[in-house]
C-alpha cells in the first residue's frame, strides 16, 4: 500500500483520502460480506495513519464487484439504507469521517436495480443518496437514476455532490452539480484502462468549467478479464491536477482541499466565470446579460424530444451485444 499527497489537515478546508481499492473478485454473498469487512478495516487504518482525515472515498463496485453474470441477482443486491450501509455508518462514526461508498441497490419498487452512491457523515447519518443517471450502456444493466443530483454539506465548508463513473463524461452532470451549489464533485469509478486518458481529461474539464474541485478515484488491479487503472486524481477549481495517483491497488491518494477558494473564484472572477456567464451572456453590452436559452439541445431535452441528426443510423441501441434481452417496454 503506497500513498500520494498530503498528510495533514489544513487549518481551513479539509483532508481527503481516495482509496484505489483493488477490484473485487466476487462469486458469492460471502465474498461481498468480506469486501464490506475490508472496506471497514480500511476506514479505520486510514484514519489511524492520517489522524486529520475528514473524507474517505471508495470507488464504484468496491462493495459488490463486477461479476456480470450475478450482479443483478437477489443474492448480490443490497437495500439502501440497509444492513450493509449500517455497517459503513458505524465505521464512519467510530473513525469520525465522512465516507463515500458504492452500492448496487435493490429497486424498492421491484424493477431493475440501481447503481447507487451514498455519503455518510461522522455522526453515522446518511446525508446523500445518489443513483447513477447515466449507466455505462450497453455494458451495464442498471436503471437510470431517478433522484436527480443531490448536494449536501461536507467538511471544511464544502458542498458535496457525487457522480458515478460514466456520469463524469457528461459535462451536463458536472454543471448540474455546480448549479445546485456544489463546490466539490466526487467521482467514483470502475473503468478499465481503455478510457483512462479520457477519465483524467474530464475530471479536469469538469473542475475548470464549473470552478469546483473534483475528487476522483477508480478501482485498481486485474480481475481476470480487465485491468483497472486506479489513478486517483484531485483537481483544483482552475482545472489543474493537484495530486495524481498511479496504477497501484491499495494506493491512498490524499489532498488538502480548500472549498473557500472555489467559492471566492465564483464570486470574484470576471473572465472565465463560466458557470455564471452561461446565464448572463454578453453582460457588457446587455446589462444583466441575455437570459434566453439559445441551445436547441437544452430545449429538446427538456421537452423529451432530444434526438441527434444521425440517430436513425446508430447501430447499438440495446444490450443484446452483452447478452441482455431486448425489453418489450421502455421504463421511465
From Swiss-Prot:
It comes from the Bacteria. CDD domains: aliphatic_amidase. The active site is at 60 (proton acceptor), 132 (proton donor), 165 (nucleophile). GO terms for molecular function: formamidase activity; N-carbamoylputrescine amidase activity. SUPFAM superfamilies: Carbon-nitrogen hydrolase (SSF56317). It is an enzyme of class 3 (hydrolase). Is an aliphatic amidase with a restricted substrate specificity, as it only hydrolyzes formamide. Belongs to the carbon-nitrogen hydrolase superfamily. Aliphatic amidase family. It comes from Bacillus thuringiensis (strain Al Hakam). Residues 14-259 form the CN hydrolase domain. It catalyses: formamide + H2O = formate + NH4(+). GO terms for biological process: putrescine biosynthetic process from arginine. It holds the Pfam family CN_hydrolase. Keywords: Hydrolase. Its EC number is 3.5.1.49. This is Formamidase. The lineage of its organism: Bacteria, Bacillati, Bacillota, Bacilli, Bacillales.
Amino acid at each position: 500500500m503506497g500513498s500520494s499527497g498530503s498528510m495533514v489537515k489544513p487549518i481551513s478546508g479539509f483532508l481527503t483520502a481516495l482509496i484505489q481499492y483493488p477490484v473485487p473478485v466476487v462469486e458469492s454473498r460471502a465474498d461481498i460480506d468480506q469486501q464490506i469487512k475490508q472496506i471497514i478495516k480500511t476506514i479505520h487504518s486510514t484514519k489511524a495513519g492520517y489522524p486529520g482525515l475528514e473524507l474517505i472515498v471508495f470507488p464504484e463496485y468496491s462493495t459488490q464487484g463486477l461479476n456480470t453474470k450475478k450482479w443483478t441477482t437477489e443474492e448480490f443486491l443490497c437495500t439502501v439504507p440497509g444492513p450493509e450501509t449500517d455497517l459503513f455508518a458505524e465505521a464512519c462514526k467510530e473513525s469520525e469521517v465522512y465516507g463515500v461508498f458504492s452500492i448496487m441497490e435493490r429497486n424498492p419498487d421491484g424493477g431493475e436495480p440501481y447503481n447507487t452512491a451514498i455519503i455518510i457523515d461522522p455522526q453515522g447519518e446518511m446525508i446523500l443518496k445518489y443513483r447513477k443517471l447515466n449507466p455505462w450502456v450497453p455494458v451495464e444493466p442498471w436503471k437510470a437514476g431517478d433522484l436527480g443530483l443531490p448536494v449536501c454539506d461536507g467538511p471544511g465548508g464544502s458542498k458535496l455532490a457525487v457522480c458515478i463513473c460514466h456520469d463524469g463524461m457528461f459535462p451536463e452532470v458536472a454543471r448540474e452539480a455546480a448549479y445546485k451549489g456544489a463546490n466539490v464533485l466526487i467521482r467514483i469509478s470502475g473503468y478499465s484502462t481503455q478510457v483512462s486518458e479520457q477519465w483524467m481529461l474530464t475530471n479536469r474539464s469538469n473542475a475548470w468549467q464549473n470552478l469546483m474541485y473534483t475528487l476522483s478515484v477508480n478501482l485498481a488491479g486485474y480481475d481476470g478479464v480487465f485491468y483497472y487503472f486506479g489513478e486517483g486524481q484531485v483537481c483544483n477549481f482552475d482545472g489543474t491536477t493537484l495530486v495524481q495517483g498511479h496504477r497501484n491497488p491499495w494506493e491512498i491518494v490524499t489532498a488538502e482541499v480548500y472549498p473557500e477558494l472555489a467559492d471566492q473564484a465564483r464570486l470574484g472572477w470576471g473572465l472565465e466565470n463560466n458557470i455564471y456567464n452561461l446565464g448572463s451572456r454578453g453582460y457588457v453590452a446587455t446589462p444583466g446579460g441575455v437570459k434566453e436559452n439559445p441551445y436547441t439541445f437544452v430545449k429538446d431535452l427538456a421537452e423529451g424530444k432530444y434526438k441527434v441528426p444521425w440517430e436513425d443510423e446508430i447501430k447499438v441501441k440495446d444490450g443484446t451485444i452483452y447478452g441482455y434481452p431486448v425489453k418489450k417496454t421502455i421504463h421511465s
